[in-house]
């Protein structure tokens, strides 16, 4: 579709029909990231107090929790007082979801399903006003790289299997001016198909899982293909932890900057990478905090509270990720705090029999040259099964060095089994995780 038509006509019509004020919000919030740090903190506190008051006065589930926690919402101090409020997990939200609704607000809503990396997807109900603000935040992020509403997107994502949802997603892709390249079935023929479709469609930017984009990139490099004529504005990765080796391969293959997006279906974009490489928290839409985990002394659990949702706000919601939040002076001009370290799901730690928790990034650092792809699965504390797709140039001696290095990090109490395979299939979600922990 013509980009002007997609952005100026189709998008505006859809926005109007859904009752979403995306463009209005976008104009209103554009300069917020450049406010002073003190003003941003004041704004967060004001929004948080408003959210808590609405939740207390209109949502019985939250009123009960506030009363039990003895929280005085009229004189809230951050973060001291807020820490008394219990942390909610996905199971708690799922069980009580119908009660976490402001019955005084009658709005049109939409439903979305989380990807369910934990195996338990959550149906999320969103009111259109909340969705509009979240989308405005998204476009504000994308605007940093010259991406405008209506620009063509190549989306490396999952494809529904139900005929009903296949039609729905195709319609959404059409009006969003994007093509969808399946993350579910990646092989030689599909990668050739990716290339042909991309050349014909001429997208302005890529969006998708880093593991899928990395696999496409390594194939492009192996085949000697050249797609630099696309002149992409950016390649946005999301849905998984982005590893350095993935970033390097993708940028080399497509001659374009990779930008990391961190978010969740429940809330939207939580943080976005700036031109200087910092992952800035969208502090006008979400309040993020970290809580120390018993599992790791290095990183902490990321806890999120929505700031613009009067209908069914998530308050102190455990995202399920681990990270470190810090304030820094960034030369990009954005004064939002940053996530200085993001470890992904708290299940992405290799657990040893002697109760050590080792971030799965150790696998990335161990398997460097000569390995095309790998997946490690831990089913018990004393075992780790690793599948490896090796490149022709991987010498046995080099592989032996990798094995010794991993033993050095993990110790001898954990038995490591290796299997060389021709390919590694993605999961049902379309993601290609490099480490899967099945330890409770």
Language-model-derived ranges and their functions:
Residues 153, 178, 258, 288, ...:
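Generic structural signal for residues in well-ordered beta-strands
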Residues 55, 114, 153, 206, ...:
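Residue-level signal for inorganic ion chemistry
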Residues 50, 159-282:
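Conserved adenylate-forming
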């Amino acid at each position: 579709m013509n980009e002007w038509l997609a952005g100026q006509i189709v998008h505006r019509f859809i926005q109007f029909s859904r009752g979403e004020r995306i463009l209005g919000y976008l104009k209103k919030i554009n300069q917020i990231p450049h406010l002073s740090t003190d003003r941003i903190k004041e704004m967060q506190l004001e929004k948080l107090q408003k959210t808590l008051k609405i939740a207390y006065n209109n949502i019985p589930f939250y009123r009960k929790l506030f009363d039990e926690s003895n929280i005085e919402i009229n004189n809230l101090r951050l973060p001291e007082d807020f820490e008394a409020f219990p942390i909610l997990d996905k199971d708690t939200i799922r069980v009580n979801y119908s009660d976490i609704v402001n019955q005084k607000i009658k709005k049109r809503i939409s439903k979305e399903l989380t990807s369910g990396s934990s195996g338990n997807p959550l149906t999320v109900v969103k009111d259109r006003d909340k969705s509009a603000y979240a989308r405005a935040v998204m476009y504000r992020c994308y605007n940093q790289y010259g991406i405008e509403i209506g620009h063509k997107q190549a989306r490396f994502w999952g494809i529904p299997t139900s005929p009903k949802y296949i039609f729905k997603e195709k319609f959404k892709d059409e009006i969003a001016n994007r093509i969808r390249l399946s993350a579910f079935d990646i092989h030689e023929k599909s990668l050739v198909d990716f290339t042909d479709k991309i050349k014909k469609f001429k997208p302005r930017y890529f969006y998708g899982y880093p593991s899928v984009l990395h696999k496409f990139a390594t194939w492009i490099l192996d085949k000697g293909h050249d797609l630099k004529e696309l002149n992409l504005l950016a390649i946005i990765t999301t849905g998984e932890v982005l590893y350095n080796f993935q970033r390097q391969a993708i940028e080399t293959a497509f001659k374009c900057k990779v930008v990391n997006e961190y978010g969740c279906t429940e809330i939207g974009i939580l943080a976005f990478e700036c031109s200087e490489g910092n992952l800035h928290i969208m502090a006008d839409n979400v309040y993020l905090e970290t809580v120390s985990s018993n599992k790791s002394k290095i990183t902490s659990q990321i806890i999120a509270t929505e700031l613009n949702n009067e209908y069914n706000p998530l308050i102190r919601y455990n995202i399920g990720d681990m990270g470190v939040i810090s304030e820094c002076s960034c030369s990009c001009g954005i004064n939002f705090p940053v996530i200085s370290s993001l470890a992904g799901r708290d299940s992405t730690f290799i657990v040893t029999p002697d109760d050590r928790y080792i971030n799965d990034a150790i696998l990335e650092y161990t398997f460097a040259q000569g390995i095309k792809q790998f997946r490690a699965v831990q089913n018990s504390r004393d075992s780790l099964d690793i599948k490896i797709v090796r490149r022709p140039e991987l010498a046995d001696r080099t592989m032996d060095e990798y094995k010794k290095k991993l033993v050095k990090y993990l110790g001898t109490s954990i038995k490591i089994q290796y299997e060389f395979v021709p390919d590694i299939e993605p999961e049902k979600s379309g993601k290609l995780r490099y480490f899967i922990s099945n330890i409770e």
